[in-house]
Amino acid sequence: MKNLKPLFLASLICATGLNGCDDGTGVVFAILAAGAATGLKNALDNGDDETNTSSDASTSSSSSQQFEILSTQYYDGVNDDLLTAGLGQNGLMGAAPAAADPENPTASEIRTATIVNQYQASQDRRSTSGYGTLYGPAAKTQFATPSADGKVAGKEYFAYADEGRGNQNVTMMVQVPSDFDRDNPCIVAAPAPHSQGVYGAISTVGEWGLKNHCAVAYTDKGMGNGVHDLNTDTVNRIDGTRGIATDLGKLSHFKAQGSAEMDLSAYQSTYPYRIALKSAHSQQNPEAKWGQNVLEAIQFAFYVLNLEEESGEASAADPDKTDANQEDEQTTATLKSTLTASNTLVIAASLSSGGAAALRALELDNQGLIDGIVVAAPMINPRDLDSAEGVTIKQGNQTFVYQRYRKTVFDVITYYNIYQACASANTTMGLHGRCIALRRAGLIDGNTLTTQVADAQRLLNLYGTLETTNVIAHNYEAAFVYASLANVYANAYGRFSVVDNLCGYSYAGSEGDGSPSAKSLSDLADDYQSGNGLPNSSGTDLINNEGNEEEGINFRNSVDANGELEGDLKGALCLRQLATGTSGTLNNTGIPLTGEASARYQRVQDGILQIFASGNLRGKPTIIVQGRDDALAHVNFSARAYYSLNKSTKSNSQLVYIEVKNANHFDGLNQQYNINTQIPLYYYLNQALDRMYDHLKNGTSLPVSQVIPTVPTASLEERLPEIDSEEHCEITFSDDVLTIPEC
C-alpha cells in the first residue's frame, strides 16, 4: 500500500492563461531538486530492473524540469466544468452546441464541442447499454458518488513538452478537481487513445479519475488533431483555434515540413488543397516516445499540484522581484515539493494506443513514479521472445503457435486493408469490385462473389484472427479504420513528409467522386473538435492521387483500369509491401523489393524497431482488459501476446489479463451502428480501475486472470457479470502455454 503523508488543501484560483484568463502571458516555473519532476534522463532509462531502483523517487535527482504553462482556466462546476463542459451527463447525449461563428469558434466553444464529441466517440450513450447508471459522468464508482449531473469543478492547465524547437509540441493537460484530496492525493495519467487529441481520454479514464477526486494528467502522445491546411497555410494552436503557420511559429500544435526535393509551396502548386496531419506527417515517429510522453505528463501533474496556488509550499523567492516588474518577462518560481511520487498514488490508464503508451511508460519508469496500470484493448507491439518456439495460445479446440501470431499491428492492419473490403462485400460496408480485383490479381480464389467473399474471410482468419471478430470487422471497414491506420502508421514509422505522397496517397477535402477541393473555414475550424487525427474525418479524406486523371479522388471511390470500383487496391498493396519487403501479400513470399521501394520499406521497418514493448512491468500491479471480438487490436497479436511475453520472462509478474466476451475496440460504434450483440468494454475498464485503486490503497487482492462470459441479450442487470463473479472462467499460464477457456 502507498504511504500517504497528511497534507493540506487550499482553494483553487485562476492563474495566468491564454484564451481563458486575463493577460495571456506564459509563465515558466522550475522545480528544483526536491523532486516532483525527477530528472527525465534517469526516469526514462529502460534498464531491465524488475522494480523501482530508487527507494524514494522524490529525492532521486538534482536535475530541474521546466514547463511553460500556456493556458489555465478555472471552471465553477455550474456554468462550465472539467468533465462535461457544463452540459452535465444528459447534455452529453445530444449533439455538440454550435459555435456562434462556425468559421471562428472561440477556444471555449471548441472545448465544449470537443468534449461532447469525445463522449460520442468513446462511449455507448444508450441508456439500454448502461449509460447513466453503470457508467457515465454521474454514475457511481466503488469509491465515489458524483454529483447528480456529473459536473466537476476545478482547474485546467495546458503545456507543451518539446525539444525546444517546436517540432514535437506534445500537448499535455492537467485537470485538478476542486475536491482534490491532498490528504489522500492521487494522479491518473490518461494518454489519449488512437490518434485523438489531448481530450481523447476524458470520457473514459478522465471521467473515472475526476469522480474519484484525482488529478488527471493527459497527453496527446505527440499526435492529436494537428491540421496544417497547405492551401491557407493555417495551423492549430494548443487550444484548437487556428492561425497562420508563420505567425504562430513554435506555438503551432503542428507545422508540416517539406523535403530537400520539394518544399511546401511547390507541393501545394502541384497538389492543390492538400492537408498535412500531425499523426502522419510529424516526421517524429511519435509512437517511439509514447512511454516518455506519459512520464512527462505525470511530471507536469506533480509540477502543477505543487504550484503555490494549488497549496504547494513555495521556497524562498527573490525578494527584489514583484508582480509588477515580473509582468513582462518569464518568471521562475522555485517550489518545494509537498506532493511527490513517494506520497501520491499514481495510476496510468487508457485504452487502445493510449493503453499501449501506459504500458510502455511503466516499462521505462525506473524512478517509481507509477504505482499501477489499468488498460483496455492496448494497441501494443510486444518484442520477440528469445525462444523460437515462444508461447502457444490455446482457446478451446484452437491452437495458435508463436509463428502464427507474432505479428506487429502494422503487419495485421495492412493485411486487413487488402482483404476486408472484399470480406465485407456481401454487406453494404464492403466493395464488390475489390473481390473482382483481388481475383484478377490471383490473390483470392472463387468465381462468384459468394465464394470470393468466403475466401477473403478464410485468409483473414488463417492469419491468426478469431472468427468472432468477423462481423464487427464489417463496421470497422465502413468506418475506414484499416485504410486510414495503414496509411497513417506507414507515414509515421517512416518519418515521411506530406510532400512524399507515400504510396500515391495524400489528404484533402473532397465531395463524392470529385477531385480534391478547398476545405471551408468552418470545416477547418471543426477539425480539432470533431476529428480523430485520422482520415476520413471532419471532411478530410484519404486521397488516391492517381484518380480523376491524376487530380485525385477519395480512395474509396477509386476505379481501376477495368472500370471496377475497388477502393484503390494498388495503394493497399503498396502499403502492404512496406510490411513484407516483397511483392507478396504474405511475409517471406513474392519478389524482394529493390531501389526506392526497398528504401521506403527499410525506413518503415527502422521506425517499427523503435516501438517494441519489452514486457518488463517492473513487478508492478497491472490489469489488461480486452474484448474478445476486437477486430483492430486482435487478442492474439496484442493482449494475449503481451501477457505471454510478460509471464514467460518475468517471475515476479503481477499482470492480470481479463478477456471479455462480446466486446470490441470501439464502444461508440455500437451506438453508431445500432449493434446490440456487443457490450460496453468501458464498463469493465471502470471495474478494473476500482479494483486497482482498492488494491493500492487498501491492500486487497487483485482479480485472477479470467474470461468474463457476458450475455448481450439478457437484461441490463444480468448481461454484465462482475469481475471475479462466479460466472468467470480462469485463464491459466503454464509451461509456456496460455490457456484461454471458451467460457
Language-model segments: residues:
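C-terminal motif of bacterial Sec signal peptides marking the signal peptidase cleavage site
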Residues: 17-20
